[in-house]
Structures are given as structure tokens and as C-alpha cells.
Curated annotation (Swiss-Prot):
Residues binding Ca(2+) 5: D594, D600, D646, D648
Binding positions (Ca(2+) 3): D438, D444, D491, D493
Cofactor-binding details, from the entry: Binds Ca(2+) via the C2 domains in absence of phospholipids.
MF annotations from Gene Ontology: calcium ion binding
Protein name (database record): Multiple C2 and transmembrane domain-containing protein 1
Biased composition annotated in UniProt, kind: Basic and acidic residues: 174-184
Biased composition (Low complexity): 147-168, 219-228
Boundaries of every C2 domain copy: 240-358, 404-521, 555-676
Membrane topology: Multi-pass membrane protein
Binding site for Ca(2+) 1: D275, D281, D328, D330
Residues that bind Ca(2+) 2: D275, D328, D330, D336
Record localization: Cytoplasmic vesicle, Secretory vesicle, Synaptic vesicle membrane; Recycling endosome; Endoplasmic reticulum membrane
């Protein structure tokens, strides 16, 4: 026993082997005894596979001899067994976080340098790597085999470690790929890595971490030092877990960070009938986790629907299956459930299209035959892309708080993303010989357009089978090929579900670009035709970039932008009016929307129908985004809307605040703090957002675009009946009418000689005007009124007063909206009286239009928007000169010829009134209040701090 004791003493004083290396050895010794009692070295070679090379026997007097002596001592073996369990627990809890702590896979050559500051990894390199490298050098062929490389019979002894190390940021290795790699590689060191990657996926990251470190010499340790080292490792692992987050030890998948799942919803077969007529109106929902990621269109009266719709979903991991649910659409009632199915994403082969047939089941009635759904799916790993540069673009559906999400990632090289590849301009001309859906032999038709997530709904043409819409709108093209545009025609029915007239499709990939195509489309599943004009044009200047990539700060790019919108290039693309750059820098003091007292804010920037988003800053009330958005300006009178929401993964996003900024009120290059307002833009809410905005535009193009119809928003809130809104519009209309009534009273008082001096002056003025009146004096009088008000304003005698009456009405309306939101949850949709509501809404809207028209005329002369007032002065000067030099009969003759020949010259021209189009750009009193900037008040909090849902 003396030589054996001496060997053991040498082991304790050795410099190269570490304490954990001896634990690995004793694990092998224990397994060998448990299986056959032949010892660790004796039993090991008998169970090795053919692909596993046998290590050379160690020279005498080495570490293995010493460990054999230690293993023969029973008292010491019990201590080693305890330490073995502790070591299993340490690696079970720490290994997944070691791998997941880096956003990218660690390169073997740079892993040690990248994580030099990590306490846990430094300790593991110091205490694990020297033994592996030292023993490999000493033996020349293999050295010590860790548990990953033991025999198959010994695998159950470390099942806890194997299961706990299953979470990794790398893609899960497939069996055929692993076998091919094992045949190509050679050497025991490679075999060690192969065994770990197949049975213990999480250890591959550990090997990459440990490999590049040089084997430093270890100082001599005392007998108590291994226990201290063991406690240090446990403490470091627990700290690492608390920093990164708890790992799920039961998850068997490894993720690269992001996957793209491309789904093509083909068709359904033999679906269940849910309507009384023996048919259904099916549509499909896709969910991952508890979040809806896609909803298909509705196929009416069909049990074998054909959708052929595509969806692209970005997912963080493959743990959650794809949940497919089919419903029958019921207007005004709860949709009927038609079955569901799950698709296990872990069974899909990467980068390969897979046709999937799913059998629909009802959990409550598992024996019922509910039909099948056919899909095509492609799963693609997205490696090397960082989440912190992910830009989300959500298109909210009308009256929906859910988001249809597209991920738009910034380029790693330029960190700049152009969002769409082109624009398709659509003009809906007319319908011909449509199907009669009403009892009177007519219809009230309207048309719905859908291109991907974009939707547009035309106006309703009452009581006609040959409607004339003459509407123009634009869609964005996100695919190089163009995609399929779905078109459906409907008949509007008050109080019940609208009737389906027919459908058709347009394959945009078959149309040539930069050319207008006239299409006469036959309506399938119905009667009649639709006439369209479709034009595909190049991409507009719309992109997202980091703050470091700034077009306006690059002198060369700035000169190109200024050149493009110079006054000399007036007739080059009249729709391209200007360039807008918005820097979303940060926000401060936002409202806390979560129960933790924090929020997950992201910012939405909207200009007409262009809608872009920043990334989400989690758990922060003072987020910094530092993003730059660029837009193409089509109308200089547009309003930039910036809205802050709180992201909520389980339900709709929460509203935090909003600002509305007219483009003509922007001061270029100035960083300003905008106080966030409530949803109706009538009062302040908590928080301030810092923006820096630059606008460059061509004034001549902007003036010409003022005289054509405004661009309609695709997604607008449905009008609902509101007592306060109805009263507000009535009061606004009454105020405009009262002005005319007071003017009539004033004239009548002159006729009645209530004030003789005033009546005498009015009589003399009347005689002079009538005797010398010429037609050109009408615009001249308006011109004098504008000029008079202008000099009053610049002289400091501003007669414009803040409309406190409108502000008070808006505050009352906001309180009623809050009550309606609460009451609406209690009332059922079926209890509403549709016909009465539509009549009241129509009256409400007419009052709003009349009141807005009067207020816009007043605000034009009050110089509320100086650009428009100057434009009115120029137009009135031109009209005055025309009326002065040209006889009235010639003017009327030219006007009549133009009206009679307009349809002959341009048969598909959209009817418009230039004067009304001009007035539509002037804000009403309500809009003036909404666009007012609020001064930040740092000393007092806003009066109302409440959490509003996205409406």
C-alpha cells in the first residue's frame, strides 16, 4: 500500500490535472463497476462502437494509475459519488445558458477572446481544458473519454444531464447528417465532439468555448480546495442562470435564433356544414402559441374551398406547433367552429417544400369527420440576423386590434432596408351588368380589393347594376413577381349580412411595368364585369435605417434629393411631390402599461397609407429607438402621425400616446420634444417623444396636387353612432348657419333703418357697387379680405381666437367614448338596431361635412395654413385678371366646352371639383385643435392617466 499511497499523494500535488477531470474519471470507474465489476478501463473497450477509436494505454505512473488507487478506496468512492451528482446538477443547470448567452454561434478561434470577462467560462477553461489537452498530448491518441463518449450501456446513468442540455441556439442535428460527419471525421478528439453533439446537443457550444484556451499550469491545491472550487462553480452557474433566464430543461430542440415559415394554404375537402342550407362560409386561422399570425379570406357557401393564400411567419423557436383552426363565418353572430389540427414544426425538413394533409378534429366530438386541410410549408432557418435590428411592420385591419405582422430586417452591411419593390396604381372605373341581389331587381354594389395584407373598400353605389365608381388608390408591391390581387363584389344590405355578387383575380406578375393596362374582368361565381386600370410603377423612397445611416447628413445624397425636387423639374413625375425624413430618437416618461410598472414600447410612424414601425424596447419607460424613416410625399398637406404602443404578446397592443404633425408646420433639422396626446388628440397623456424631421418638396408640384382629390386611407375606423358626436356636429353646423343668419339680420336692419347713419351708408354703397359692378370684382373682394387679415396678423392684431368651445366638446366626447368602450363589452352585437343607426350616422356625417366646409372657408381667410392662403391669393389674382380682360361670354363658352368634351378627351377621368379639393386641404376647427402642439409640463403630471386599448 505504500507505493499506492505515494501515487495518491502525487495526484493531489499534480499541476496539470484538475479536480473535475478526476470526477469524470471516477464516473467511468463507477459505471464500469455497476455493469460488470471489471473496472473503468477494463469495461470500457468492450462496449465501444466500431466508429469509436480505442485510446492508447497510458504510461505507468500517470494520472489513471492514481485514480485507480483512489477508486479502490470505499470511503473515498462515496465522496466521489456525491461530487458526481453535484457535477451533473451543475452542468444540467448551467450548460444551456452557456450556449444561449451569445446571440451568434461562437467561432472556435474567437470564443475565448469574445467571452474573456465571463467568470464562469474562465473557471471552466482553467479547470476542464488543461486535463483534456494535457491527457491528449500525453497519450497521443485520445486521452480521457467523458460521459458523452462512453458506451451505450452506460447512457442511462446520465439521463438527467442529457435531458437538461437539450436547449441550444444551434439547429437540431439530423440523424443522417450526423452519421455522414462521423464517417468523414477521424481521431479521438473529433469523436469526442461527435458524441457530445449527438447525445448531448448542448455540449457542442461548451467545446467551442473551451477549445482555443491554452493549457495554463495549475498551482498546487490543498485537500479542501476541490470543495471550494465546487461551490464556486455552483455559485457562478446560479449567477449565470439569473442573468440569462431560466432554461427549459424539457425542451429537446435547438434554435438558431429565428426561423421563417412559409405557408401556402391550398384548399379544404369535405368540410363540415354549419349553415341551414347545408353549406358553410369557411375561413382559416393560424396560431403559434396563443398568438394569431394569419387569417384567410372567407369562401362563401362552399364545403370544398380553394384558398391558395400564402403567409410568411417569423418564429423564434420550434417548440410551439402551428395550430390550424377552421371557422364558419356568421355575420352578426359568433362564428361556428369547424375543426382544428396541429402541425409539429420539428418534423419538417429544412429548406424543402412539404405538402401536408391535416385531418380536422373537434376535441369535444373526436369521432366526427370534419374534413381535411391541405397545406404546403417551407421551413428556413434565419441565421446570422440579430433581433435588435428587426423592424416590424404591422397592418391593422379595419376595426381590429390585432396585427398582421411582417418582419423587415436591416442589412448587416448597410443597416438600411427598402420596404417595398414597387407600387401598383389601381383605378376602379365601373361595373357592367352585375347580378341583381335585392327584391327590386337592383343592387347596392361595392368592391373589396386585397393584395397580401393590404385591403381597400370602394364606396357604395345605391340601386344600380351598372355602377360608376371612378376611384383611384395604390397598393405596395412587396414581392418581385407582384403577387395575386383578389377582387370581390358585394351588395350592401342594411341590418343583415351583405350579399356576395362575384369574385375575380389579377395576376400582377403577368403585367408589364410602367404601362397602364385596361382590364375587363368577368366575375366568377356570379354575373357581370368589372373595368379596371392597373399601372405598375417603380418603388418609392420609403425605407428604415439606423441613426448612423442618415441620407440628409450625407452631402452627396442630400444634393441628389435637392436636385430631384428642384423647381426646374416640375413635370417629372407629378405624383412625387417631396421627401420626408423622420428621426425617432427616444421617449421619456411613458405610461406604465404592465403590472410590473413598466412598458414594452414601440413606435408607429404613419404618413397617409405608409405605416412603419420601430423595434420594441422591453421593460422601459424611457426607450431609445434611434431609427430613421424616409417617406415619399404625395401630398404636402398630409399629416404625419407618430403613435406609441405597448407590445403585448398575448393580446392587442396598448395605446400609450400619439402626436399629429402637419408637414407644412415642420421646421427642418430641429429636434423637438412633442407631448403625447390621447387617442382622439384632444388632450395630453403621459410622456414626451423626441423627433427630428426634415421635409423637402417642390412647391409647384405641391400646388398642382392640391387641386386633385385627396388620397383616401385604406384603413379607417367605422363610423358609429355617438350621442355626443351627433350633438357636436349639430352645434358646429349651427354656428356656421348662425353666421349667415346674423348677416341676413344685419342687412334687414339696414332696410328697416334701425340705425339711420348705417342705413344711409349702406344705401350709398349699394348704388356705387351696382352701377360700377364688374364680374372681376368678386375675386378681387375676396383678395382684399385675405390681404386685410394678413396685415392684421403681421401687425400683431390677430383676431383669431382659440376655440375653447370645440375643445370642451372634444373632451366631453372622449369621456363618452370611454363609457362606450366599457358598455360595449356588455352589449351584444345582435341587440343593435341597424336601420336606425345607419340613418343617424348618415345625418351625423352630413352635419360634419357641412360644418367642416364652413370652418374651412373661414380658416382659409384666417391664414390658418399660410401656404394655402398664399395659393388662394395667386389663384384669385389670376381669376381677377381673367375676368377683367376677357368677356364673360368667352369664359362661359370655354367652361362649357371643357365640361362637354372632358369625357371624350379622357373617358376614364375621375370627376372632381377643384375648389372642393382645395378646401379639403384646409383643416377644420376640430383638426386645428388636434394638430396643436402641447408644451411639456415637467412639474405636473397629466390629469388623466389611463390605459387605452388600440381601437
Amino acid at each position: 500500500m505504500e507505493p499506492r499511497a505515494a501515487t495518491t499523494g502525487e495526484l493531489v500535488r499534480a499541476a496539470s490535472p484538475s479536480f473535475q477531470a478526476r470526477l469524470w474519471k471516477n464516473l467511468q470507474l463507477g459505471v464500469g463497476k455497476g455493469k460488470g465489476g471489471g473496472g473503468g478501463r477494463a469495461g470500457g473497450p468492450e462496449h465501444r462502437t466500431a466508429a469509436t477509436p480505442t485510446p492508447s494505454p497510458p504510461p505507468p505512473g500517470t494520472t489513471q494509475d492514481a485514480l485507480a488507487g483512489v477508486g479502490s478506496t470505499g470511503s473515498r468512492w462515496s465522496g466521489f459519488k456525491k461530487r458526481k451528482q453535484v457535477l451533473d446538477r451543475v452542468f444540467s443547470s448551467s450548460q444551456p445558458n452557456l450556449c444561449c448567452s451569445s446571440p451568434e454561434p461562437l467561432e472556435p478561434g474567437g470564443a475565448g477572446r469574445a467571452e474573456q470577462g465571463s467568470t464562469l467560462r474562465r473557471r471552466l477553461r482553467e479547470h476542464l481544458l488543461p486535463v483534456a489537452k494535457g491527457s491528449s498530448t500525453a497519450t497521443g491518441t485520445g486521452g480521457v473519454t467523458p460521459p458523452g463518449g462512453r458506451s451505450p450501456d452506460s447512457a442511462p446513468s446520465s439521463s438527467s444531464a442529457s435531458s437538461s442540455l437539450s436547449s441550444s441556439p444551434q439547429p437540431p442535428p439530423r440523424g443522417d447528417r450526423v452519421r455522414d460527419e462521423s464517417t468523414r471525421r477521424g481521431g479521438p478528439g473529433v469523436h469526442l465532439c461527435h458524441q457530445k453533439s449527438s447525445s448531448l446537443p448542448g455540449t457542442a457550444c461548451l467545446e467551442q468555448l473551451l477549445e482555443p484556451a491554452p493549457p495554463p499550469a495549475e498551482p498546487a491545491r490543498g485537500p479542501a480546495e476541490p470543495q471550494a472550487l465546487q461551490k464556486d462553480i455552483e455559485r457562478d452557474c446560479s449567477q449565470k442562470i439569473s442573468t440569462v433566464g431560466n432554461s427549459n430543461a424539457d425542451v429537446p430542440l435547438a434554435d438558431p435564433g429565428m426561423y421563417q415559415l412559409d405557408i401556402t394554404l391550398r384548399r379544404g375537402q369535405s368540410l363540415a356544414a354549419r349553415d341551414r342550407g347545408g353549406t358553410s362560409d369557411p375561413y382559416v386561422k393560424f396560431k403559434i402559441g396563443r398568438k394569431e399570425v394569419f387569417r384567410s379570406k372567407i369562401i362563401h357557401k362552399n364545403l370544398n374551398p380553394v384558398w391558395e393564400e400564402k403567409a410568411c411567419v417569423l418564429i423564434d423557436h420550434l417548440r410551439e406547433p402551428l395550430y390550424i383552426k377552421v371557422f364558419d363565418y356568421d355575420f352578426g353572430l359568433q362564428d361556428d367552429f369547424m375543426g382544428s389540427a396541429f402541425l409539429d414544426l420539428t418534423q419538417l425538413e429544412l429548406n424543402r417544400s412539404t405538402d401536408v394533409t391535416l385531418t380536422l378534429k373537434d376535441p369535444h366530438y373526436p369521432d366526427h369527420d370534419l374534413g381535411i386541410i391541405l397545406l404546403s410549408v417551407i421551413l428556413t432557418p434565419k441565421e446570422g440576423e440579430h433581433r435588435d435590428v428587426t423592424m416590424l411592420m404591422r397592418k391593422s385591419w379595419k376595426r381590429s386590434s390585432k396585427f398582421q405582422t411582417q418582419s423587415l430586417r436591416l442589412s448587416d452591411q448597410h443597416r438600411k432596408s427598402h420596404l417595398w419593390r414597387g407600387i401598383v396604381s389601381i383605378t376602379l372605373i365601373e361595373g357592367r351588368d352585375l347580378k341583381a341581389m335585392d327584391s327590386n331587381g337592383l343592387s347596392d354594389p361595392y368592391v373589396k380589393f386585397r393584395l397580401g395584407h393590404q385591403k381597400y373598400k370602394s364606396k357604395i353605389m345605391p340601386k344600380t347594376l351598372n355602377p360608376q365608381w371612378r376611384e383611384q388608390f395604390d397598393f405596395h408591391l412587396y414581392e418581385e413577381r407582384g403577387g395575386i390581387m383578389d377582387i370581390t363584389a358585394w351588395d350592401k344590405d342594411a341590418g343583415k349580412r351583405d350579399d356576395f355578387i362575384g369574385r375575380c383575380q389579377v395576376d400582377l406578375s403577368s403585367l408589364s411595368r410602367e404601362q397602364t393596362h385596361k382590364l375587363e374582368l368577368h366575375l366568377e361565381e356570379g354575373e357581370g364585369h368589372l373595368v379596371l386600370l392597373v399601372t405598375l410603377t417603380a418603388s418609392a423612397t420609403v425605407c428604415i435605417s439606423d441613426l448612423s445611416v442618415n441620407s440628409m447628413e450625407d452631402q452627396k445624397e442630400r444634393e441628389e434629393i435637392l436636385k430631384r425636387y428642384s423647381p426646374l423639374r416640375i413635370f417629372n413625375n407629378l405624383k412625387d411631390v417631396g421627401f420626408l425624413q423622420v428621426k425617432v430618437i427616444r421617449a421619456e416618461g411613458l405610461m406604465a402599461a404592465d403590472v410590473t410598472g413598466k412598458s414594452d414600447p414601440f413606435c408607429v410612424v404613419e404618413l397617409n397609407n405608409d405605416r412603419l414601425l420601430t423595434h420594441t424596447v422591453y421593460k422601459n419607460l424611457n426607450p431609445e429607438w434611434n431609427k430613421v424613416f424616409t417617406f415619399n410625399i404625395k401630398d404636402i398637406h398630409s399629416v404625419l402621425e407618430v403613435t406609441v404602443y405597448d407590445e403585448d404578446r398575448d393580446r392587442s397592443a396598448d395605446f400609450l400616446g400619439r402626436v399629429a404633425i402637419p408637414l407644412l408646420s415642420i421646421q427642418n433639422g430641429e429636434q423637438k420634444a412633442y407631448v403625447l396626446k390621447n387617442k382622439q388628440l384632444t388632450g395630453p397623456t403621459k410622456g414626451v417623444i423626441y423627433l427630428e424631421i426634415d421635409v423637402i418638396f417642390n412647391a409647384v408640384k405641391a400646388s398642382l396636387r392640391t387641386l386633385i382629390p385627396k388620397e383616401r386611407k385604406y384603413i379607417e375606423e367605422e363610423n358609429r353612432l355617438s350621442k355626443q358626436l351627433l350633438l357636436r356636429n349639430f352645434i358646429r353646423t349651427k354656428r356656421c348657419v348662425i353666421v349667415l343668419v346674423n348677416a341676413a339680420y344685419y342687412v334687414n336692419s339696414c332696410f328697416d333703418w334701425d340705425s339711420p347713419p348705417r342705413s344711409l351708408a349702406a344705401f350709398v354703397l349699394f348704388l356705387l357697387i351696382v352701377w360700377n359692378f364688374e364680374l372681376y370684382m368678386i375675386p378681387l373682394l375676396l383678395l382684399l379680405l385675405l390681404t386685410w387679415n394678413y396685415f392684421l396678423i403681421i401687425s400683431g392684431k390677430d383676431n383669431r381666437q382659440r376655440d375653447t368651445v370645440v375643445e370642451d366638446m372634444l373632451e366631453d366626447e372622449e369621456e363618452e367614448d370611454d363609457r362606450d368602450d366599457k358598455d360595449g363589452e356588455k352589449k351584444g352585437f345582435i341587440n343593435k338596431i341597424y336601420a336606425i343607426q345607419e340613418v343617424c350616422v348618415s345625418v351625423q356625417n352630413i352635419l360634419d361635412e357641412v360644418a367642416s366646409l364652413g370652418e374651412r372657408i373661414k380658416n382659409t381667410f384666417n391664414w390658418t395654413v399660410p401656404f394655402l392662403s398664399w395659393l388662394a391669393i395667386v389663384a384669385l389674382c389670376v381669376f381677377t385678371a381673367i375676368l377683367y380682360f376677357i368677356p364673360l361670354r368667352y369664359i362661359v363658352l370655354v367652361w362649357g366646352i371643357n365640361k362637354f368634351t372632358k369625357k371624350l378627351r379622357s373617358p376614364y377621368a375621375i370627376d372632381n371639383n377643384e375648389l372642393l379639393d382645395f378646401l379639403s386641404r384646409v383643416p377644420s376647427d376640430v383638426q386645428v385643435v388636434q394638430y396643436q402642439e402641447l408644451k411639456p409640463d415637467h412639474s405636473h403630471s397629466p390629469y388623466k392617466r389611463k390605459k387605452n386599448n388600440l381601437g
